[in-house]
Every structure is written in structure tokens, then in C-alpha cells.
Amino acid sequence: LGSRNLEPCGARSIAMATVSVPLSVLRLLEVALTCVSFSLVASVGHSSSSYWAWCMFSWCFCCFLTLLILVLEFARLSARLPISWDDFTTSFAMLAALMLLAASIIYPSVVFSCPGCARQVAASVTSCLAFLAYCVEVGVTRAQPGQVSGFLSTVPGLLKVLEAFVACIIFISLEPARVSAFPGLQWCVAVYALAFIFSLLIIILTVGRLLGACPCPLEQVLVAFNVLAVLMYATAVIVWPVYAFRNNPRPSNCRHCPWDGLVVVSFMTCVNLLAYIVDTVYSVRLVFFVTPS
């Protein structure tokens, strides 16, 4: 009996070690790459651009949170935290990949345009490599049997992370002067904010293992919210371009000017609308067409 009980435990320990060692090496690489990226950009100098601030925040956030994950796992403290650790690490890796993808595109194309500037080019390259490292982490985690366990590790959970991320890109691209002049644009900002708050709330409740305290079934709540979000974003897709570009053509001397931010918001609004439509279809299918086994 003793040998039969110990063997599965030993097998699980070996399996966990097989997974955790490559992940630890991968996370060390992620820390190094993101640290190099923000160090190189910081050494160049400060910029007042909101896109520069977003890129710096992305590199710093990913670097220090990945380092915190490593410390907690090496100290074996992750199991003692009152959170869903697998949900947390999976959703963070997904979010980090999205943030670094945005930073890898925004920084070389918007923040600087100096092909001969070695430090900026090197920062862009290391940012791209860090993005690839986080993508590998997401793939490795989801490929392991039994790793896709929590809500944030499922397709609807990852869509919630994507929706929150796209909303962040929208927020940093807003032009306050234009928004404050038109109630229609203010409605769009309210749509972005309300949908973002709910998605963020779902993520926080999931990581904090507090979804069980919800008096209503989670699946039905998600369906209701997703349908509402689709309707609100559908209005924003129409209203935003109408008021943002009415009597507001692109300036002739516009090179990375605020007008470009209006285009980014329009595009990202369409992206989030598609994400919420997919999320709604998936949620409706789970609630009404998939019978629990």
C-alpha cells in the first residue's frame, strides 16, 4: 500500500519539476530582456508622450512582476497565497505578451524614428524577444496536462484579459480636448470605461478566488454582460468616427500627432467589439448548448 501511495506522488513531483524548470529558465530570460529594454530606453532620456510612458510601464511592470513570481516560487510561498496561482500566472503571461507586443510596435514606429540610434534599436529588439518569450510561456503552460484549470486559463478568461488590454490602449490614445467637446465621444469613453471595469473585476475576483461569493451563476452573469458590452461597443464603433473625424481632417504636417490617436481608438474599438462578440458566442454556447458531464 505504501509503495502504491508514494509512486503517484513521486510521479507528480517529477512531472511538476519537468514543467517548472523550463518555466523558471524562461522567466529568468523574460526578466533579463525586459530589464534591458527599459534600461536602454531610460538611458536615452525622458519623453512627454503617453506612448513612451506606456512602453516604459509595460517593460517595468512585466520585469518586476515576473521577478516577483520567480521569488515566490523559489521560496515556495506561492502555495500559501490566498489566490489562484495558476490563474494568476497564466493570465499575467497572456497580458505581458499583449503589452510587449504593443510596446514592440509602438516604440519604434511612434516614439522614435532614428534608425541609426543603437540603443533605441536594441531596446526594440529585446522587447520583441521578450514578447516571444512570454508567448512561449503561454504555449508551454497551456500544453501541459491539467494546467488549464481555472477560468482565466480558458478561452473566455483569456478573452477577458484581451478586452482589458485593448481598453488600456484606447485610454492612452484618447485626445482629452476632442473628447470634452462632444457628448458623443464622452459616451464612447463611458462605454470603454464600464466594459473595462467589469472585465478587470472578473479578473480580480478570479485571481482572488472570490467568484464563489457571487449570488448569481457566473456563466449567466458573463452572458448578460457580454451581450450588453456588444451593444454598447456597437454604438461606439459608429459614434466615435462620426464625432472624432467630423470637420477634422488629418493635418498636413501631422507626424505622430494627436489625430493619429483618434484612428487608433477607432481601430481598437472594432477589435474589442469583435472580441466581445466572440466572447458572447462562446459564453452562450457554454450556457445553453453544452450540457455538463
Regions found by a protein language model. Give the residues of each.
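Cytosolic juxtamembrane helix and N-cap/initiation of the first transmembrane helix
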Residues: 2-30, 48-52, 117-124, 143-164, ...
